[in-house]
Amino acid sequence: EQGLIVETDSEFIDKKVINAEKKVFDPQNAEAVYQRAFNLLKKSQYDQAKKAFKNFLKNYPESDFSENAQDWLGDTNFVMQKYDIAINEYQALLSIFPNSKKVSHALLKIGYSYAELGNVSDAEKILIEVVQEYPGTTAARLAEERLRKISVGN
């Protein structure tokens, strides 16, 4: 009788494993999980959004939404004024997605974060990089504005 229970349990476990594997590679499920995290962010539920984005990135690293999730994770920490963590999250985006359209935004926010931490030297260095590497973009314009504020001591 115990053999039957074990066999049934292993069949049940095998089905759970198969279903779990399907979820990991299911793009529709990935989108739904991403959307739930994003909705938490829109509702200003930042701690929950952070957890949801981290969970998403852990479970769906190859998803089309992964670079957005990584960027939002940086933004969430930035809004929460956790600038050191924000810098790390933006640097992760640069490392994992070096060709992303989000690179200029991530660099800009790294510069902003350094400025908020009072690290003017690194802030200026990063913001100048944004201006030079991404001329004519919104990120470059915002970097120039922040550089002007830094130079007058604001």
Say what each PLM segment does:
Residues 1-43, 48:
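Acidic, proline-/serine-/threonine-rich low-complexity intrinsically disordered segments
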Residues 59-65, 96-102, 132-141:
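Short solvent-exposed coil/turn linkers within tandem alpha-helical repeat scaffolds
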